[in-house]
Amino acid sequence: MGESEMKKDTIILGIETSCDETAASVVKNGREIMSNVVASQIESHKRFGGVVPEIASRHHVEQITLVLEQAITEADVTWEDIDAIAVTEGPGLVGALLVGVNAAKALAFAKKKPLVGVHHIAGHIYANRLEHEFVFPMLALIVSGGHTELVLMKEHGDYELIGETRDDAAGEAYDKVARMLKLPYPGGPQIDRLAAKGEETIEFPRAWLEADSYDFSFSGLKSAVINKIHNAKQRDLTLSAEDIAASFQASVVEVLTEKTYRAAKEYNVNQVIVAGGVAANTGLRKSLEKRFSGEDFPLYIPPIQLCTDNAAMIAAAGTISFEKGHRSLLDLNANPSLILS
């Protein structure tokens, strides 16, 4: 029997509905994307200036069947080919998560397939493995709307939290400042675009915290920006939105970059990866690439389409769990406050 006959490919169907994207994907061996379908709801939430949970859930219900069918069709696979179904079980919006979890449970039952629950942030981390194989020990900087964390990994599926935000996540701060500047939703990309046209003319605070801490804090920065805008209005002064964006972004990016660099050095890692929606930010990407250039370990940032929520990353993370023998029962429930462990 040849080696190819001995080792069968592992094909996983991934499902992601934790926030405002309904997504399904088929991934082979945790590395090869066979299909990656995403139905975004940005237009539906734009007029509200943020994600409305009830609307998000309704859209997921409308889209989930179509998205799943499209993912299977585009991958050109049958249900016989699929080894397991991986689904985001948390964290996220509970109503949104339930749509994906229930769809996954129904399919697992009907098609007699193993079910694997996946942590959303583990998914963001494993989006990187769709581009580059992991080399341990490895450091992951996770920056998204709800999370800002530094995670040390010594092997697949092993997550040691060495730093996290003590208040607002970086993405939350971006969204709140964007609303103050009356920018359309989603605010993060809008600030990134404005910042590219502005100058860092305003000295906003950097929260370094304790000397040995890898934690983050963005609430003070957010308040400083809001106060600056309010004070300017009261004095009838006109502040450049571009300069506010550039100054705000410089503060966020410097802290993220320096703490990541310091942690990478202290823990003597072989690889640094960046994950999450804010990893699409061009200011952050440039800062990290500049800081890590010339180092003897690589920095990897996934392409834009793998930074934002998608199901390929859930299938990639689910592959590792599946191969380690992890299985979820059919009473799996959505867990909006699931801890990465």
Curated annotation (Swiss-Prot):
Substrate binds at residues 142-146, 175, 188, 192, 281. Fe cation binds at residues 120, 124, 309. Its cofactor is Fe(2+). CDD domains: ASKHA_NBD_TsaD_bac. Its EC number is 2.3.1.234. GO terms for cellular component: cytoplasm. Keywords: Acyltransferase, Cytoplasm, Iron, Metal-binding, Transferase, tRNA processing. It comes from the Bacteria. GO terms for biological process: tRNA threonylcarbamoyladenosine modification. It catalyses: L-threonylcarbamoyladenylate + adenosine(37) in tRNA = N(6)-L-threonylcarbamoyladenosine(37) in tRNA + AMP + H(+). It is found in: Cytoplasm. It is an enzyme of class 2 (transferase). InterPro entries: ATPase_NBD, Gcp-like_dom, KAE1/TsaD, TsaD. Gene3D superfamilies: 3.30.420.40. GO terms for molecular function: iron ion binding; N(6)-L-threonylcarbamoyladenine synthase activity. Its main location: cytoplasm. Binds 1 Fe(2+) ion per subunit. Required for the formation of a threonylcarbamoyl group on adenosine at position 37 (t(6)A37) in tRNAs that read codons beginning with adenine. Is involved in the transfer of the threonylcarbamoyl moiety of threonylcarbamoyl-AMP (TC-AMP) to the N6 group of A37, together with TsaE and TsaB. TsaD likely plays a direct catalytic role in this reaction. PANTHER family: TRNA N6-ADENOSINE THREONYLCARBAMOYLTRANSFERASE, TRNA N6-ADENOSINE THREONYLCARBAMOYLTRANSFERASE, MITOCHONDRIAL. Belongs to the KAE1 / TsaD family. This is tRNA N6-adenosine threonylcarbamoyltransferase. It comes from Oceanobacillus iheyensis (strain DSM 14371 / CIP 107618 / JCM 11309 / KCTC 3954 / HTE831).
